[in-house]
């Protein structure tokens, strides 16, 4: 999905794409990394912190209602404001009945020219998370499958996939902004 600087237009476009995928029979729909805006991590700009939001919050509420309406699981990648000065690159998982199942915070944060993610994001909380925890590697028991969610750069570190698989994930999802 191509994005613009218009957050509301991007959200509406994502909603339309979710509806299209559901109409074609999709059961689990994963949006791209940080879908609500252009990929902003190519520059270090304090104004971009205004893009962050609480999770759960308005986006997860809207996607929960949509998931329930369509009977699909939605994986949404959002810029999370956890506390003042504490931000994460986070995915929220909404089950097919609209229930917010929880979140996963990106563990591996790149910092290379064009990918200044360490300027914006704190790594996720590692540890022996249980299914009810809001931290660490975890699985989400959805209506359709036990899923694991990791984010973009996490794919270059095989222990993330291994841990999540050993925890019982049937399938892994990796929302990414860079392909």
Where do the language-model regions lie?
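Short, acidic/polar
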Residues: 10-18, 157-163
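Generic N-terminal amphipathic, Lys/Arg-enriched alpha-helix
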Residues: 1-4
